[in-house]
From Swiss-Prot:
It is a multi-pass membrane protein. It holds the Pfam family DUF4112. InterPro entries: DUF4112 (IPR025187). Keywords: Membrane, Transmembrane, Transmembrane helix. Induction: During S phase of the cell cycle. Residues 181-240 are annotated as: Disordered. The lineage of its organism: Eukaryota, Fungi, Dikarya, Ascomycota, Saccharomycotina. Disulfide bonds: none annotated. Residues 197-210 have a biased composition (Low complexity). The keyword Acetylation does not apply. This is Uncharacterized membrane protein YLR326W. Present with 1520 molecules/cell in log phase SD medium. It is found in: Membrane.
Length: 240
């Protein structure tokens, strides 16, 4: 019966922790398609940053990825001039023959940077290279291909993939830390409320028995018989 109650409580605790995880994830992280801007509660837009639970190195690397994606798709002036115009990649696609290859090389630099800083898994890199291939096929169309490549915004899509991956991984890491802290607190609380050791009770009982034995009166043996001489000279058996 105690095993059934224990398993039931563990199941309820696991469901509760999963609900808490989902609630924490919904409040602190949401996937995005726009890696450049986010909107505050008051409706104002500002530059998108990684969530607060990410490390400083992750945040610094994200700024570099963000600036490179902006340079490729949105602005010729680079990160110092955040004006939504046109980036280098669509212009390179206008060059005959070599243009699409140069555009592919530009977009691939973003993947190399992200992989070097975040150690991306294989499935994420395959997805990002797939976006570059689509952009390359679109840019093969003369003139209009450059327009389609600009609208497709390959580096923007790949930067959003990087943001979502890094944010989700950091969220799982933060949640694991919270779970570990909770388990440690439960261990300490259980140790403080643990029942006395059974062996100690045995020793106490043993001491009580010993005290009873010490309180008993000592057992005295009867005196040994001895032979004494009577007054008439005959030996007489008796006790001294």
């Amino acid at each position: 019966m105690s095993g059934f109650i224990k398993s039931t409580l563990l199941g309820l605790g696991q469901d509760y922790l999963e609900d808490q995880y989902q609630e924490f994830a919904e409040q602190h992280f949401q996937p995005t398609r726009d890696p450049f801007y986010e909107t505050n509660k008051d409706g104002k837009k500002h530059r998108r940053r990684l969530p607060y639970y990410c490390t400083k190195d992750e945040s610094k690397a994200w700024k570099k990825v963000q600036n490179k994606a902006w340079l490729h798709d949105k602005s010729l002036c680079g990160c110092c001039c955040w004006t939504n115009t046109i980036g280098w990649a669509p212009l390179l696609a206008l060059l005959p023959v070599i243009g699409p290859l140069l555009m592919y090389w530009v977009h691939d630099k973003l993947i190399e940077l992200a992989d070097d800083r975040y150690k991306l898994p294989a499935e994420i890199k395959v997805k990002m290279h797939g976006n570059i291939v689509i952009d390359l096929l679109i840019s093969l169309v003369p003139i209009l291909g450059s327009v389609f490549a600009w609208l497709h915004a390959c580096s923007t899509r790949n930067a959003a993939i990087v943001y979502n991956f890094v944010g989700k991984r950091a969220l799982e890491r933060k949640q694991a830390e919270l779970m570990h802290q909770k388990e440690e607190n439960e261990k300490h609380s259980n140790a403080n409320t643990a029942p006395p050791v059974v062996g100690g009770n045995k020793n106490v009982n043993g001491n009580r028995n010993n005290s009873k034995m010490y309180n008993r009166p000592p057992v005295t043996a009867p005196p040994a018989p001895a032979y004494t001489r009577s007054t008439n000279g005959r030996p007489q058996r008796g006790y001294r």
